Amino acid sequence: MTFPTRSLLPLAGIAALALTVTACASPSSSADDAAPADATETTVVVENAKPALMQVEEDGETYWTEDTEIPREAVEVAYQPESVVTFDIATLDTLHAIGAGDTVVGIPEVALPDYLSEYADLPKVGSLFEPDFEAVAELDPELIVVAARSTGQFDELSNIAPTIDLTGAYGGTFDPEGGLVRAAQLGEIFGEEEAVAELSADIEEQIATIQSEVDGTALVLSVSGGEYGAFGEGSRFGYFFDTLGFTPAVAAAELPGQEGSAHGDTVTNEFILTANPDWIIAFDRGAATGQGSSAEETLDNEIVERTTAAQNDAIVYLPASELYIVINGLTAIHNVLGTVHEAVAG
């Protein structure tokens, strides 16, 4: 089992799964007298897959979101479902990587990375945020998957088919370790545990290798419409500092702008020069959302050219769709980390 893009390094263990496989045979069955496979209904209990929702009013609008004070519940779903609607593109990515992509029958309107282009013509079921419930129902799926952007739609989608929320702890944050746990759950659901374990091992090896090679300060930037958003440690893209080991060129507390902004703290070329990072790690949010690519053009200016990163050819352009749209699918994680590894390895 390999990724559809550049090869990976091999790697160790994965977090324990919170899944239980239940074979529903007759009460008189035993280990020596089990019902034949075609007479057995098999289900998988997916732990932490049902969020508790609460209604919120903000700026005159009312919407549903997860009440994180209430523990999540388990959801029982069919083993090896043959028809899946997913609003979570990380799930599409992972199912594709483990050979179960043909089970996906519907996805939201979204710009897909090239390696998922074969799914572009699937029936559309709304947006990442707003499902088209009628379109979902017409597809009659055995399983619906939501995450992060679509979590608030969990209850209504559950009225159509068994639904699981695979947001996990990361909730829109680049979190490879969390992504591996969710991938392992999908492996259990689809009977592809070995494929997930193999690809996850490769990713873990990438992480360990990068950690052994990282040196210097960094500034993580999203670029869109000629503007920059900077992310510090502990942010949705803080993984590059918190886990991989880059030293923040500017501490998160010292970044300007609105603390915790989903799009980062707005900074300027002059700010970047003053921070003078050894590495600039950038991704093109505009390109990820289908608004055209501008990151390299934006950073190609006489002010940024004076930074240590620019002078040492140490501006790293991450694959934007993988980092911003797909986020934590197996191939997306592999591609993002592969780009970083290639840069730091020289």
Whereabouts are the PLM-identified features?
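Short helices/loops that flank or line small-molecule/ion binding pockets
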Residues: 79, 133-140, 267-276
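Alpha-helical, coiled-coil/dimerization segments enriched in small aliphatic residues
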Residues: 111-112, 233-263
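Short helix-initiation/N-cap motifs at beta->coil->alpha
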Residues: 70-71, 125-132, 258-267
